[in-house]
Amino acid sequence: MRLAPTTVLLWAWGSLQAFEIVEKENIFQRTPCPAFLVFDNTAYLADMSFELPCHCKPEDVSAVVWYYQKYLGSSHTTVLTDFDGRLLTEAAHVRVGSSMLARFSIRMFSLLVFRAQPEDSGLYFCGTRNGDYFYAYDVDIQSHKGMVASFRDKGQEPLPDEYYGSLHVFTTFWEWTPCDRCGVRGEQWRFGLCYLQNPNLSPRYIKTLPDVVSCGSRAVPWKLHLKTKYHTPELLIQSCLVSCKKNKMGEGILAIYNYVSKLGGRPWVPQVPIQFHQQRLGHGLIISCPGARPEHAVAWDKDSQPLYRTQYLKGVNRSMRVFIDHGNHLHIRFTQLSDRGIYYCWRQGLKIAGFRLGVTSRGRYPASLSDPETRTAVELTLIGYLLIAVVFVTIHLCRCCCQSRCCPNFSAQTLLQL
């Protein structure tokens, strides 16, 4: 009978030893660093956030430093490090247009860049404080300006491939997003980024397919890059219809609702949180969906009217006053009284938020340089004064030149009097 406790004890001790072995196992021991530094090519769309893992490092290195170069061999190298304690935990903390030094974070040896811009394209190195590099990336951030949208419901197809001798330029599409709405007709889409195939690419760049890299890769020679600059990213859109998942209302809210209903009044219970905003008549407004990213399936409704991308996507009509940009933001230019209402936001097929917009034509609002309209008015006023000053000085200079030619005895004192 004493063998049973001994057996259990030995089994437990063996399990602890096995657990200790697994605990000490290091992922970097299974991934040796390359003897010759190469660059892993990757591409993203502007305003996206991306992560670059440091796939290998020596076992004795406890912390990594990320470096950035615009071009290989550049004399200017940016050091990306969080040794000063500056960490960005959420992309919501990052403002649009801020410097990359305010949009990155290092977590578990990986570099995270939020809301990437085309200026962030370049080479990223994972290394140490002493400048020893272990792993490197060739990152291509493609701008969504000039993005071509194709609507399958209208029979439109993506852009055809382009051939220039041995150069093959084409579009590589991401996976389809989920349907942006449920219970009603919705839309889904997928982004397409520019890629090329050519046998004369640098062997230092790792390619997913043989001789294939993104169009903005540093492996592409300048002559080939000029031929690809007109092949912009694409957006393919099609209709979809999915059913909604049943969402059970909380027991507490349901009890209050039933109690008030028995008293004779049925209260209005909003399906999603609603935020109120009051806007001045004639001014612009941009509404963002909470927690949404450019790669998410985001939809907008005004009250019960869906705002489909086939009609409201930016670029469909140049004279559009209300449109949705490629970053899933809703723009209202020159707000009118008819814009009053509740604007609902869908994210990944779920309605998550509402914005009640009120438009007022009365009241005085203090001018602020943070207001785009105020900045535009100040800039136009300064430009007007500058033009008037230039014209004034030009007229007087011409007058002085004419008088000096016609009257040789025209003295400098007379010029000063003018």
Curated annotation (Swiss-Prot):
Q: How does it sit in the membrane?
A: Single-pass type I membrane protein
InterPro entries to which the protein is assigned, alphabetical: FAM187A/B, Ig-like_dom, Ig-like_dom_sf, Ig-like_fold, Ig_sub, Ig_V-set
Query: Where in the cell?
Result: Membrane
Write down the glycosylated positions: N317
**Primary subcellular site in the record, as a coarse category:** membrane
Name the cystine pairs.
Answer: C289-C345
Q: Which residues lie on this side of the membrane: Extracellular?
A: 19-376
Q: Which GO terms describe its cellular component?
A: membrane
Which residue ranges does the record assign to the Ig-like V-type domain? 267-361
Q: Which residues cross the membrane?
A: 377-397
- List the Cytoplasmic topological domains: 398-418
Signal peptide annotation: 1-18
Keyword terms of this UniProt record:
Disulfide bond, Glycoprotein, Immunoglobulin domain, Membrane, Signal, Transmembrane, Transmembrane helix
Identify the PANTHER family for this entry.
FAM187, IG-LIKE V-TYPE DOMAIN-CONTAINING PROTEIN FAM187A
Q: Which family does it belong to?
A: Belongs to the FAM187 family.
Q: What is this protein called?
A: Ig-like V-type domain-containing protein FAM187A
- Where does this protein come from, organism-wise? Rattus norvegicus (Rat)
